[in-house]
Curated annotation (Swiss-Prot):
Sequence intervals crossing the membrane: 413-433, 454-474, 491-511, 525-545, 562-582, 638-658
GO cellular component, one term: plasma membrane
SUPFAM superfamilies, per the entry: P-loop containing nucleoside triphosphate hydrolases (SSF52540)
Protein name, per record: Protein brown
NCBIfam families: 3a01204
Organism, as annotated: Drosophila virilis
Tissue expression remark: Expressed in eyes.
Superkingdom classification of source: Eukaryota
Entries under PROSITE patterns matching the protein: ABC_TRANSPORTER_1, ABC_TRANSPORTER_2
Principal location listed in the UniProt entry: membrane
Length: 668
């Protein structure tokens, strides 16, 4: 794709030179029973790939399966981690990963959204993270309305994402990436899973975003009616649905034709990059002829190398030498079939690649240097962008978690019903435990242990499934800089705090009414507080288990050994003096000891039978001593603090593991 001086001036030109990407490959030894002896070698995915993209271009990356389309897309966009070499520059300026994420967006092949949100709520929520911190709420709402109009989702604005069609979800994902009004759009298989019409609509939307030229705002009420558009105000600001469109010239017919093609031509009115065209590059698999014609340029890949890169209409000329395209044949299908077919001793891909390398030798001569000052000014403008503060990120994420819970209220009520059924079952089993006798000492200890276990297991296993399921969203949004990983983690933990206290006291209410009613209201308050702390500590334990594995199945299966070890050290199945140090690693121990201490420490008299052959504990202090629990005055608060410390340790380890995984894997 040669560039002249006119193209370079006033344009943003992204160039990639000699990109090479290797991944480790393992070969299993045939002579080892355990397959422990493995030879490490590197498998090349990209080989000396060079090219460029300028604003106004819509490029399609074509190639067979395994040709390296998605890898090239990720490498150019700086979303790829691993052994990547080569240069990516913007008008001659080297681009780092954080700089690239500020000026570009990446549309994944498969949509990743909070399915319980509506289309409007999803965009409005993301606008808080992706727009400048000083943007007002009214401006955010205006931007969201414009985006919904731009991608043709105005009528589905208040429909839940899980109820949208495949094409609508794809366009919503595109709108979400357009919130920042990026200059460069990287789209990985944007037509996957869509019917021909939906796929055409998505690519057509991208085409208009890339080729638009801004015009003055117009009132469209005469064409579409007052209900559809608002007239811009005198000060130049737009109304609720005023738009700007692409036109080819200043003729009246061009404007009317552009209007007829709504809603796929709408763009943000208050775009900070409004005077600058966009550029999009898409990996795409077998596009139809109509879709293929929408692309301004194509890149053909074979075996991790470029076979052809240039304007779409010039590709046919490139392939005419030695290859005959059948009549009425989709050009994209012909090019891909040519690459796949063998031609004599060499395959067609090798022949075409050699021809392309000969024709483009010395093509990339640095014409982007003409616009280097322009890109420098643009990057200064981008770097002045200020995200919302960390504490506000936490607040918004807590709201999102709670909104998800409210949207799934039915499943939440079912789970809560089973939880309370367990409480009723335990209350019936221990309903005969009332007076304080030698026979009831063990019953009370067992019921307290069951309270502790139920809270810990319920919350730990409830959290175990969260991170494996949320990893795709975390990887995308954290890698894109939407919010920090620490904000997400803290918000997740905080969202469980009110749930822990609510469930803790509700569960205890059923048990307390049938067993401990003679002890008064203060005991109810303190026991509920301890159960809630146990639940909070269990959240840390569950997140720890979840962070060790990438799948919820592995996390649940491997949790059993941890549960067994910590449970044995809890003080019921084994005297804690038998494990003087190991008990301090068990949250079951702290929870059980605190509950037992809180119940028994004020008991001064326990009846002893006259002919009882077993040891008789006459006070609550003796009950605690028999179980080898601590009896100091500070035991209650020490155990409370210990539960929080255990939770903190689990969270620190979990956060470290998750951050390491995110940094290692990146966007993919």
């Amino acid at each position: 794709m040669p560039m002249d001086e006119g193209d370079a001036q006033g344009s943003l030109l992204l160039e990639w030179k000699q990109l090479n990407y290797y991944v480790p490959a393992q070969e299993q030894s045939n002579y080892s029973f355990w397959n422990e002896c493995r030879k490490q070698r590197e498998l090349g995915i990209l080989h000396d790939v060079s090219g460029h993209l300028k604003t106004g271009d819509l490029i399609a990356i074509l190639g067979g399966s395994g040709a390296g389309k998605t890898t090239l897309l990720a490498a150019i966009s700086q979303r790829l981690r691993g052994n990547l070499t080569g240069d990516v520059v913007l008008n001659g300026m080297a681009m780092e990963r954080d700089q690239m994420t500020r000026i570009s967006s990446f549309l994944r092949e498969f949509e990743i959204n909070v399915k319980t949100f509506t289309a409007y709520d999803d965009l409005y929520f993301m606008s808080h993270f992706k727009m400048h911190r000083r943007t007002t709420k009214s401006e955010k709402r205006q931007a969201v309305s414009d985006l919904l109009l731009a991608v043709g989702l105005r009528d589905a604005a208040h429909t839940r994402i899980q109820q949208l069609s495949g094409g609508e979800r794809k366009r919503l994902s595109l709108a979400e990436e357009l919130i920042t009004d990026p200059i460069f759009l990287f789209c990985d298989e944007p037509t996957t899973g869509l019917d021909s019409f939906s796929a055409y609509t998505v690519i057509k939307t991208l085409r208009h975003l890339c080729t638009r030229r801004r015009i003055a705002k117009h009132s469209l009420t005469q064409v579409y009616g007052e209900d559809s558009f608002a007239t811009p105000s005198d000060n130049g600001s737009s109304g609720s649905n005023s738009i700007e469109m692409e036109i080819v010239d200043n003729s009246h017919e061009s404007l009317l034709q552009a209007m007829k093609e709504l809603p796929t031509l709408g763009v943000l009115n208050n775009s900070p990059n409004g005077t600058q065209k966009k550029a999009a590059i898409c990996s795409i698999h077998q596009p139809t002829s109509d879709i293929f014609e929408l692309f301004t340029h194509i890149i053909l890949m074979d075996g991790g190398r470029i076979v052809y890169q240039g304007r779409t209409e010039q590709a046919a000329k490139f392939f005419t030498e030695g290859f005959m395209q059948p009549k009425n044949c989709n050009p994209a299908d012909f090019y891909l079939k040519t690459l796949a077919d063998g031609q004599g001793s060499k395959n067609a891909g090798e022949l075409l690649r050699a021809k392309y390398e000969h024709e483009t030798d010395g093509l990339y001569s640095g014409s982007w240097l003409l616009a280097r000052n322009y890109s420098g000014d643009y990057m200064k403008h981008v770097q002045n962008f200020k995200k919302i503060r960390w504490i506000y990120q936490v607040y918004l994420l807590v709201i999102r978690f709670m909104t998800e819970d409210l949207a799934n209220i039915r499943s939440g009520l079912i789970g809560f019903g089973f939880f309370m059924t367990t409480a009723v079952t335990l209350s019936l089993m221990y309903s005969g435990v009332g007076g304080l006798t030698q026979r009831t000492v063990q019953d009370v200890g067992g019921s307290i242990f069951m309270l502790s276990n139920e809270m810990i297991f319920t919350f730990s296993y409830g959290v175990t499934y969260i991170f494996p399921a949320a990893l795709p969203i975390i990887r995308r949004e954290v890698a894109e800089g939407t919010y920090s990983l620490s904000a997400y983690y803290v918000a997740l933990v905080l969202s469980f705090v009110p749930v822990a206290f609510f469930k803790g006291y509700m569960f205890l209410s059923v048990i307390y009414a049938s067993i401990y009613y003679t002890r008064g209201f203060l005991l109810y308050i303190t026991m509920g507080f301890l159960m809630s702390l146990s639940a909070i500590a269990a959240v840390g334990y569950g997140v720890f288990l979840s962070s060790l594995f990438e799948t919820d199945k592995m996390a649940s299966e491997c949790a059993a050994p941890f549960d067994l070890i910590f449970l044995i050290f809890g003080g019921t199945y084994m005297n804690v003096d038998s494990v003087p140090l190991l008990k301090y690693f068990s949250l079951f121990f702290y929870s059980n000891e605190a509950l037992m201490y809180n119940f028994w420490i004020d008991i001064d008299n326990i009846a002893c039978x006259v002919n009882d052959e077993h040891p008789c504990c006459q006070t609550g202090l003796e009950v605690l001593q028999q179980a080898s629990f601590r009896t100091a005055d500070y035991t209650f608060w020490l155990d409370c603090a210990s539960l929080l410390v255990v939770a903190l340790v689990f969270h620190i380890v979990s956060f470290t593991l998750i951050r390491r995984y995110i940094n290692r894997s990146g966007y993919y």
